[in-house]
Amino acid sequence: MIKRLRNYWINRTTRRRFLLGTAGGGFGIMGAGYAYMRLWESGWLETTRRNVPLKQPGATIKVLHLSDLHASRVISLAYLRRAFGVGLEMKPDLICITGDFITWKYKQYDAYAKVLRALSDHAPTFACLGNHDGGSWAEGRMKIGTSSSQPVRDLLANANIRLLHNDHTVETINRREINLVGVGDLWNDECNPNTAFAKLDDSRPTVLLSHNPDSKDLMRNHPWDLMLCGHTHGGQVFLPGLGAPLAPVKDKRYVRGLHQLGDRWLHISKGVGNLHGVRLNCRPEVSLLNVS
């Protein structure tokens, strides 16, 4: 009887230790995974280079495409400065930023403008606004955004970055004239392509800046050759076999990379910043497009 009781307590203690050890190991793996997503991959910049042959061939223009900077508590200006440095090392001729300069309300605008100015000091720099940059969606989201995009507009002006908000302009780069068009954000109900493309001379190649790739459906009947987008963060969490289930778009076919749509091209940046400071199988991206 005594022997049976001793074996019972030994087995029970061993089982308890096993269960506690297994639980501890599981929590350890989870902790290590979270640390990887937050402390490593979220700041592990990836540089991509892609060729974009337009239907109207001409001199090659090197376009640096940046998106979703998301300056915030978790995305520091020091990190953005480093990302810009990586991009400028590729010696772009033109820089395009497709929105979400901030995440919610922001205070360090003067310091931010100085960091952004490194871009415009190097090459002509253009931008459109994203859903976090102010508007009806930004104001309504948990009441920590703002209804006005004026602070971000002022930021861009102070950084010598030209905002294209339902507007277009003509730029000559490497002796090649191109149209640059920018539209307002889809989620903020400010995307107005009819205004943006009004009186556009479509004999020139046209590069379109629009934060949300779902807006492509509104652009179907307008003349553009290359559309630059962000918004998705590439899904931010990319799972084998599942793709990017968290990507905030209706059309999950287009969440990252370069896509050919007939004789047009769509490029979606995975973004430089992120929300909540984490990424998984989806490194932040600095893209150079060789547009020819």
Language model: regions and residue ranges:
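Binuclear metal-dependent hydrolase catalytic cores centered on His/Asp/Glu-rich metal-binding motifs
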Residues: 137-161, 165-168, 173-210, 216-217, ...
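N-terminal secretory signal peptides and thylakoid transit peptides that target proteins
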Residues: 3-26
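N-terminal active-site segment of His-dependent metallophosphoesterases
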Residues: 24, 28-113
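Active-site neighborhood of phospho(di)ester-bond hydrolases with catalytic His/Asp-centered motifs
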Residues: 66-67, 95-99, 125-131, 164-166, ...
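Active-site-proximal beta-strand elements of phosphoester/diester hydrolases
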Residues: 60-70, 177-185, 207-210, 265-271
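Beta-strand-turn-beta hairpins that frame and shape the catalytic cleft
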Residues: 54-63, 161, 169-180, 260-265
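Conserved beta-sheet core of the metallophosphoesterase superfamily
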Residues: 213-287
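Core catalytic region of metal-dependent phosphoesterases/phosphodiesterases
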Residues: 78-172
